[in-house]
């Protein structure tokens, strides 16, 4: 089991409270949404992976926001394409 200290992660984010929010969002992406880790897993839980990514400067609130906006754009584009296909009378 890996030991992770949050001090380096806090330095990357700025304060403990924002670090917790960022780590929770990223851990949820890994665990629930199936996003790939940006660091070696080493049989770690998603929260530990998220903290390691933050420590290395790979993840912050800005990168998570950008990723979320991109996902929304892709989902909206797929919905528009589906509606257009239905309107044209063909199925997907």
From Swiss-Prot:
Any idea which UniProt keywords this protein has? DNA-directed RNA polymerase, Nucleotidyltransferase, Transcription, Transferase
As recorded in UniProt, its EC number(s) are 2.7.7.6
Q: How does it assemble?
A: The RNAP catalytic core consists of 2 alpha, 1 beta, 1 beta' and 1 omega subunit. When a sigma factor is associated with the core the holoenzyme is formed, which can initiate transcription.
The family database entries (Pfam families) matched by this protein are listed as: RNA_pol_Rpb6
**Naturally occurring in which organism (per UniProt):** Shewanella amazonensis (strain ATCC BAA-1098 / SB2B)
Q: Which SMART domains match?
A: RNA_pol_Rpb6
Protein task = Promotes RNA polymerase assembly. Latches the N- and C-terminal regions of the beta' subunit thereby facilitating its interaction with the beta and alpha subunits.
Superkingdom classification of source: Bacteria
GO CC terms on record?
Answer: DNA-directed RNA polymerase complex
Give the family this protein belongs to, as stated in its UniProt record: Belongs to the RNA polymerase subunit omega family.
GO MF annotation terms? DNA binding; DNA-directed RNA polymerase activity
Q: Which PANTHER family match?
A: DNA-DIRECTED RNA POLYMERASE SUBUNIT OMEGA
Q: What's the catalysed reaction?
A: RNA(n) + a ribonucleoside 5'-triphosphate = RNA(n+1) + diphosphate
The identity of this protein, by name, is: DNA-directed RNA polymerase subunit omega
């Amino acid at each position: 089991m890996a030991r992770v200290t949050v001090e380096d992660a806090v330095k990357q984010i700025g304060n403990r409270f924002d670090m917790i929010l960022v780590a929770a969002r990223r851990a949820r992406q890994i665990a629930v949404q199936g996003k790939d880790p940006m660091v070696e897993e080493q049989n770690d839980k998603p929260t530990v992976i998220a903290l390691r990514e933050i420590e290395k400067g790979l993840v912050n609130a800005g990168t998570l926001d950008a990723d979320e906006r991109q996902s929304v754009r892709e989902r909206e584009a797929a919905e528009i394409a589906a509606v257009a296909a239905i309107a044209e009378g063909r199925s997907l």
